[in-house]
């Protein structure tokens, strides 16, 4: 069956459904059901103008907008996790080649042809494309009751997911400044998964899409049975898929914090043909669990300070910072904020003809240069790759009985 996903590793339990017609264009959004984790997810392709030329006040506003997005997701009491995925893919020049072939003039000057060809060749090797995805994950346990009130079954769950999509999209387009938010259909999601496993296949797919505009009989879609790799091998230090190797590492936020945009060096490839990708996940802790954790942390901080005073010991700076953080967390929860414990995973992908160990060391160096501490996901490289490269809502913190 070409509609059944054939994906390796942790993605084996994923099933893709076509949701009911949605929006003004009546698109059938792809609904991702993970039978192993018992979750539902939807993925959107987004476009953001970036913050490279923004001043401090503008960046602070974007930070507040992200916090507002997490608060909105937490108040729904349904969204379990929000994942932001970015992939910087080497430019293959497929769109430019198609445009040049359509607009080429037979009487063009020969020198102009040579200059443009040389410029295209040089700029293509030095350019990258950025793909950004946002995925919201909803556990079955949180949506089952409300889905029953909305009609029950698969359609009831889709109605609840569509309501959540509307709330999240309003935050993305408004305070966060996204210029485009497009919820992916099943063929579009299959294309994103296929180019995640094999970045080199994109040029052929783009050409097929161009030919389909002239000849509707051309099949430019990627079946889900072919969206995964033809072969995958999870070794100790890297992950092999088709003719590509990948190395994944988690990143830990330093105690002193970092400036917004500090992840940029991680996304900068060091050589032509190298792809970088990372995902920043925001698992949202339920309000009751957050209150319990905050109360325990504040009680532990008060107990530690009391013991130090009774024994005549001096409270260290690290202990004072942790106590201040615990009390500040309780105050923020009392004001209605949500508690999240974000984490990030970054991945580098290169062809098998290039040494993956060398590019893994370069990835670690980029992480340290950005101000973070890298931790290789040895023995779990396949999970790290799926979480940071394939936009299907794979998480590193969610258990199978969630």
Question: What is each stretch, according to the model?
Answer:
Residues 1-402:
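Extended, folded cores of ATP/NTP-driven motor/assembly subunits in large transport
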């Amino acid at each position: 069956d070409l509609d059944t996903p054939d994906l390796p590793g942790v993605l084996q339990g994923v099933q893709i459904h076509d949701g009911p017609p949605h929006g003004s264009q009546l698109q059938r959004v792809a609904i991702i059901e993970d039978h192993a984790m018992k979750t539902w997810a939807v993925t959107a392709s987004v476009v953001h103008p970036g913050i490279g030329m923004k001043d401090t006040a503008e960046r602070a506003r974007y930070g507040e907008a992200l916090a507002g997005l997490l608060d909105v997701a937490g108040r729904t009491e349904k969204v379990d996790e929000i994942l932001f995925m970015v992939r910087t893919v080497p430019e293959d020049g497929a769109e430019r080649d198609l445009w040049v072939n359509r607009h080429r003039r037979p009487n063009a000057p020969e020198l102009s042809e040579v200059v443009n060809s040389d410029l295209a060749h040089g700029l293509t090797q030095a350019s990258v494309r950025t793909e950004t995805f946002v995925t919201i994950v909803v556990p079955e346990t949180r949506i089952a009751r409300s889905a029953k009130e909305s009609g029950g079954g698969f359609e009831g769950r889709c109605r609840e997911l569509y309501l959540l999509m509307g709330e999240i999209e309003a935050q993305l387009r408004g305070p966060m400044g996204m210029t485009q938010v497009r919820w992916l259909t099943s063929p579009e999601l299959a294309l994103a998964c296929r180019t995640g496993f094999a970045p080199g296949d994109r040029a052929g797919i783009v050409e097929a899409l161009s030919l389909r505009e002239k000849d509707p009989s051309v099949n430019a879609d990627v079946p889900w049975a072919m969206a995964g790799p033809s072969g995958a091998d999870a070794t100790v230090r890297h992950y092999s898929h088709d003719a590509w190797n990948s190395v994944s590492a988690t990143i830990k936020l330093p105690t002193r914090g970092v400036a917004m945009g500090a992840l940029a060096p991680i996304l900068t490839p060091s050589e032509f043909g190298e792809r970088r990708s990372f995902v920043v996940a925001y698992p949202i802790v339920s309000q009751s669990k957050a209150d319990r954790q905050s109360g325990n942390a504040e009680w532990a901080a008060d107990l530690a300070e009391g013991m130090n005073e009774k024994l005549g010991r001096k409270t260290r700076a690290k202990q004072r910072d942790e106590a201040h953080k615990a009390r500040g967390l309780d105050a923020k929860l009392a004001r209605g904020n949500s508690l999240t414990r974000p984490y990030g995973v970054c991945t580098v992908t290169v062809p098998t003809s290039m040494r993956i160990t060398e590019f893994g060391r370069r990835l670690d160096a980029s992480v340290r240069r950005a101000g973070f501490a890298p931790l290789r996901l040895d023995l779990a490289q396949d999970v790290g790759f799926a979480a940071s490269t394939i936009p299907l809502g794979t998480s590193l913190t969610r258990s199978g009985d969630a």
